[in-house]
Regions:
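Non-catalytic helical/linker scaffolds that mediate oligomerization, partner binding
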Residues: 1-188
Length: 188
């Protein structure tokens, strides 16, 4: 609200890292341009077995509102000291992509790790391969079914755009937008 009142177009990403953030998640997603799923911090306050469940719910809620999601913390933690990730880490990255996260973030791996370049390249390879495997038509249908209310014009145009792009096997979608909202809705 403060940013809007001052006429700024700065995008706000809200870091969700504790129970208070989880309890206010819907309002936070609505108010922000996106969220960061800070799994490491969450794991300190929230039981470990709840973190993956909450991660999936947070991504789903943000995607439903056409908001960005950054999944972060310990994505390739083993690459701080090793040149290759664990298979579990590779699977974790792919699952975040399959769930609909719009960005994955390295922390210690690139800030203080012994293999920062390798970590970036590895994460990129895993993400790109996962993206190639996504059933985008199925994802679009699930997003459409998850919506509770009647779609507005932008949402209807977004679905139609994605459907036509899928039918034509389009390599890309280009959209004109003033605020980026239409592009975000198409991207989800």
């Amino acid at each position: 609200k403060i940013v809007e009142d001052r006429g700024s177009k700065i995008k706000i990403i809200a870091k969700i890292e504790n129970m208070q953030g989880i309890q206010n998640l819907e309002e936070i997603i609505t108010a922000a341009d996106g969220i960061m799923v800070a799994r490491g911090d969450m794991g300190v306050e929230i039981p470990l077995e709840e973190v993956p469940i909450l991660q999936k719910k947070m991504i789903k809620m943000a995607v439903a509102q056409g908001k960005h999601v950054i999944t972060a913390t310990q994505m390739l933690e083993s690459m701080i000291k090793n040149p290759r990730p664990t298979r579990a880490e590779a699977t974790d990255i792919a699952n975040a992509i399959y769930d609909g996260t719009t960005a994955i973030m390295l922390s210690g791996e690139s800030a203080a790790g012994l293999y920062p370049v390798e970590a970036v390249k590895t994460m990129s390879r895993i993400a790109e391969r996962a993206e190639q495997d996504i059933d985008y038509r199925g994802r679009m249908q699930r997003v459409k079914e998850d919506r509770q209310e009647t779609p507005d014009i932008t949402t209807a145009i977004s679905y139609a755009t994605c459907s036509v792009a899928s039918d034509l096997n389009a390599a890309a979608i280009i959209t004109v937008t003033m605020s980026g909202f239409t592009a975000n809705m198409i991207a989800r």
